[in-house]
A protein has these predicted regions:
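Nucleotide/phosphate-binding catalytic cleft detector across ATP-hydrolyzing
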Residues: 1-161, 178-193, 205, 212-235
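Ser/Thr-glycine-rich phosphate-binding loops at phosphate-binding pockets of nucleotides
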Residues: 164-170
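PRPP/pyrophosphate-binding module of the type I phosphoribosyltransferase fold
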Residues: 171-176
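Long, charge-rich alpha-helical interaction segments
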Residues: 196, 200-204
Length: 235
């Protein structure tokens, strides 16, 4: 199994998306719901700091500052739980590698880093297993850039890097292998806006409001078990 360990520390990348939380080995929706007692209808609850949390049942709404509430912290703990379970690790020192939209990183980088580092020790329980994680460091990078940083030498002339997520689209101009900082943009244009437009078109044409999950599945797979009059509009 592929491990990411450097000087005895687990390197854990977490993409804190508006639609989904992504790690090396796990992906789940970014919604989170807290309960005072263990939920009866799920076996996938995270227990942390005296509460139970169910994640992954829905997407989180768009926010311009990911440190403005507790959700992304809980989602980070959930990401650690799922990723460490996959790696068969229950106790470790960890370095988190995370991202922010390219146009926000200058203003929000330090605040987001402090937000994720506020507790050095994190204890939680997941699937009946106790975990203990010591956060050694958090490193914040521009979203999307990590995907090409090792191949910048291949980018001759003018190139545009586009990272299209659920809530935002990040674009970066790369000239002869060098990112141009003045030509980096973050727009509130992502998959969610496509789904909203799709749903609005269906409502206007048929008077039927298609559920969000059905529209999302159609975008993912290109088909749905629906009448042609609906799928033709969705296309």
């Amino acid at each position: 199994m592929e491990h990411y360990n450097y000087n005895g520390k687990e390197i854990i990348g977490i993409d804190h998306g508006f639609g989904n939380i992504k790690c090396r080995h796990v992906v789940f929706r970014s919604g989170v719901k807290a309960y005072d007692s263990e939920p009866a209808m799920t076996s996938d609850a995270l227990y942390y700091d005296g509460k139970y949390y169910v994640v992954g049942e829905e997407h989180k709404g768009f926010v311009s500052d990911k440190s403005q509430d507790e959700d992304y912290y809980i989602l980070t703990v959930a990401a650690l739980a799922k990723e460490l379970e996959f790696r068969h690790i229950t106790e470790c020192e960890a370095v988190l590698a995370v991202g922010l939209p390219v146009q926000w990183i200058g203003a929000q980088k330090e605040a987001f880093r402090k937000y994720l580092m506020r507790n050095e020790l994190i204890e939680f329980q997941y699937h009946g297993q106790d975990y203990l994680v010591r956060i050694d460091d958090v490193q914040v990078f521009p979203q999307g850039f990590a995907g090409v940083v090792q191949r910048l030498g291949d980018f001759k002339g003018l190139n545009i890097l586009a990272d299209i997520g659920n809530g935002t689209m990040n674009t970066m101009l790369i000239k002869d292998g060098k990112p141009i900082s003045s030509r980096c943009y973050t727009d509130k244009l992502g998959v969610e806006q496509c789904i909203i437009r799709m749903s609005n078109e269906l409502l206007a044409v048929s008077g039927f409001a298609m559920p969000y999950d059905v529209c999302e599945d159609f975008l993912r797979r290109g088909n749905a078990e629906l009448a042609e009059k609906y799928t033709s509009v969705m296309r």
